[in-house]
Amino acid sequence: TAEGKPFFWMGDTAWELFHRLNREEATSYLKNRADKGFTVIQAVVLAELDGLHTPNAYGEVPLENDDPTKPREAYFQHVDFIVRKAAELNIFIGMLPTWGDKVFKAQWGTGPEIFNTENARGYGKWIGNRYKNDKNIIWILGGDRNPRNETDVAVWRAMAAGIEESVGREKALMTFHPQPNGVQDGGSAKWFHQDDWLDFNMFQTGHCREILLWDRMEYAYNLKPVKPVLDGEPIYEDHPVCFNANELGTSSAYDVRRAAWFDVFAGAFGHTYGCHDIWQMYAPNRTPVNGPHLPWYLAVDLPGAGQMKFLRNLIESRPMFERVPDQTLITDALTVSDRIQATRGNDYIFVYSSVGKKFTVNTGKISGNEIISHWYNPRNGEVKENGKTRKGPQQEFVPPTSGYGHDWVLVIDDASKNFKRPGQK
């Protein structure tokens, strides 16, 4: 935070927030997210869905004649309002100055491509200056585009340099949102890992079910220099799975839970949730993109969104800065469909069993002689105590229920630490 106080990144995806919602709607959305424990909202200034030419809720477009050096004050006053309303609610804005199609349109983008290195730096400097005193801004360059060549890379570097020129290197927290890429690419690391402006790496792991999320996290987590890592776009709730709803159906709360718990236990410092109906702020009067089912103002209460706080609550209920991913705690991680993922601190262990399969834990890897364990339910935050035992190298644990949708988290603590119940602040 602005006071230097750490917080857990629990993000939501609202790409069209500035572009499509009016002030009353934006306020309602932000309050809903604050109540559900979200701490970051990712939103785009020059938005994806014809953001340069289709005006915002007040009839304003962002630029004069698509010129990034000529931003229009009336459009940005609406952005200002939303940024400040978020601050009142203790929410950070993960601000994308532009969607990636304004740099590289690609086959499916609207564009037009308006940026070069010169005007990207100028726009970065201008927008950085406008928000340099807002303490709740985290800068996200990119926007669902991988640079196609060195020219694109140079444009993004120029925009970053412009922002830093206005905000200051130490104050401009910045990353880059790419398209999905390979395990050995490391998300944003592929192009920018050595750049000083890139403070942490971001992935898009995409909208299919059986993605090896943990391999991607592990690779980026271990890169040098060390930079934190985050999945900025995993599978969204209520999204056509792999863009093929006819054969694969629509993603569920369980799909988004799996992605969140896998990512965080594999080394991410937080997580961004998304919902297909919400990123586009779908409403009955809007042209739908890829078959949304609900208007955004109903989708805000889908179960997956309400379950994200149980992840945040658990992480915050134990010392979170000593936590590391550690698969050596368990003997068998199983397969992609029934994966088991483990993480620990000095005096606690968390193990996520995605379908409630039993597993064996080396509890000797944490402090103390005696341990106490609990089952934590990621669907509702409920806790079941297992009691105390001595530590041991091979201790078997069997979740309370098993099967598709029956995910469980085992919490093991050094009993001498007298931690609060899992998930309690």
Show the residue positions of the predicted features.
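Active-site mouth of glycoside hydrolases
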Residues: 2-212
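Extracellular glycoside hydrolase catalytic/binding regions
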Residues: 136, 142-280, 286-298
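Short, flexible, glycine/charge-rich loop motifs used to bind or transfer phosphoryl groups or to couple energy/partner
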Residues: 31, 127-130, 188-193, 218-220, ...
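Aromatic- and carboxylate-lined catalytic core of secreted/periplasmic carbohydrate-active enzymes
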Residues: 5, 228, 237-239, 252-388, ...
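A short, sequence-level motif marking secondary-structure junctions
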Residues: 11-16, 365-367, 390-392
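Structured core elements
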Residues: 42, 58-60, 230-231, 272, ...
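Short hydrophobic-acidic sequence motifs that mark active-site Asp/Glu residues
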Residues: 40, 200, 231, 372, ...
